Amino acid sequence: MLGRFQPFSLVRSFRLGFEACCYPNQKCATQTIRPPDSRCLVQAVSQNFNFAKDVLDQWSQLEKDGLRGPYPALWKVSAKGEEDKWSFERMTQLSKKAASILSDTCALSHGDRLMIILPPTPEAYWICLACVRLGITFVPGSPQLTAKKIRYQLRMSKAQCIVANEAMAPVVNSAVSDCPTLKTKLLVSDKSYDGWLDFKKLIQVAPPKQTYMRTKSQDPMAIFFTKGTTGAPKMVEYSQYGLGMGFSQASRRWMDLQPTDVLWSLGDAFGGSLSLSAVLGTWFQGACVFLCHMPTFCPETVLNVLSRFPITTLSANPEMYQELLQHKCFTSYRFKSLKQCVAAGGPISPGVIEDWKRITKLDIYEGYGQTETGLLCATSKTIKLKPSSLGKPLPPYIVQIVDENSNLLPPGEEGNIAIRIKLNQPASLYCPHMVSWEEYASARGHMLYLTGDRGIMDEDGYFWWSGRVDDVANALGQRL
């Protein structure tokens, strides 16, 4: 399984192609070099992979060489309309400074775990990238977590450090009394809090850490907790390769991101959980992540931002698209830069897709996945669009419809949505959670992972969701 494939070869491919397309006067390749076929991500994986070194730092160098687009790595707009931008070079330096804080001040090292309860903010990304550099496993938690749930996740993950903002600090304090592994609390706030280290003060004086951990591709990178509706949330571990590189599938094949694109994910816009899969996938493509924080979802704010800023790619859930369409002045707005719209988080009605297309001239492409697996199926520009379909499976997954006895069902018959696992190309490259399932499935005599969803596959290989059958994870598009 471990071959000579180098992760940065994909980034280098973009470099050659981007030079040819956007810098015609420079000496460069005579033709656009396309990234390797996505199957190579499964068939040949390098033994070592570290997203911070192999992707972020490389885009930082391309940026220094003038071989990136005009937009930053991260673009933030405050509620007051104030703008801040961070280049890949700045993100690299600030993540290195954050790494010094984690290693030297918090005494964290390779193999330790850090829980982070922050909304999408620059500081949250610096800290997560610092964890990647050091081989520390980060555990994202929602700012909506209660003290009881924080205690549960801390005890389950055995985290040695927790990061939170001013609003969450009192909640955390009430939760950590019986969490024996927790040693350090790190506060991201303009104010200080007794018993907490001040991240903003520390990062002003911290030196950039020049070393990084030579992490293995299958070393743990992050732990996510499933939402769970009938049982306790489950831990799902993602590898360095799985989260750092495997999710580039979504940014490339579903969102069609290029280094000249700007992605705005509305799921992160109003205090939602930290969505690292979308962010890392965007940066893998050398594209820009756009942030505009809203206390609550506000259609008018969204429409104003889309018409004012050069956002090329919009990601939202179906309800958000519906609310935007229902705004009384929707038809008066013009989105000059917008060219790609994607949806996840539930089935989207054909009426919403049709109205959006009629007014904006843009299709909405749907995606389907789970915390345990990441993106499984998607519609995209490369296949015929069938409104309300989940689309077709994405590598490395073989998605099938099976009956209660795990027998393959023909097109048109409703059954369980399942993933057929091939041991010679294990899905554990994306998610080590699948390793234990392989062992369990082998003992049962078949290699199937049941998603807990019901659906149908049509004659053309498109999948259609019809409902839940048990509690595996959030129904559709569980965001990471």
Curated annotation (Swiss-Prot):
Positions of ATP binding: 226-234, 366-371, 453, 468
Gene Ontology terms: cellular component: mitochondrial matrix; mitochondrion
Domain of life the protein comes from: Eukaryota
Subcellular location, record wording: Mitochondrion
Obligatory cofactor(s): Mg(2+); Mn(2+)
Group of enzyme by EC: ligase
Transit peptide, residue positions per record: 1-21
EC number per UniProt: 6.2.1.2
Residues that span the membrane, as ranges: none
One GO MF term: medium-chain fatty acid-CoA ligase activity
Catalytic activity line of the entry: a medium-chain fatty acid + ATP + CoA = a medium-chain fatty acyl-CoA + AMP + diphosphate
Main subcellular location: mitochondrion
Keyword line: ATP-binding, Fatty acid metabolism, GTP-binding, Ligase, Lipid metabolism, Magnesium, Metal-binding, Mitochondrion, Nucleotide-binding, Transit peptide
GO biological process: acyl-CoA metabolic process; fatty acid biosynthetic process
Record text on subunit structure and interactions: Monomer.
Role this protein plays: Catalyzes the activation of fatty acids by CoA to produce an acyl-CoA, the first step in fatty acid metabolism.
Similarity annotation: Belongs to the ATP-dependent AMP-binding enzyme family.
Protein name, as recorded: Acyl-coenzyme A synthetase ACSM6, mitochondrial
Species of origin: Homo sapiens
Species classification: Eukaryota, Metazoa, Chordata, Craniata, Vertebrata
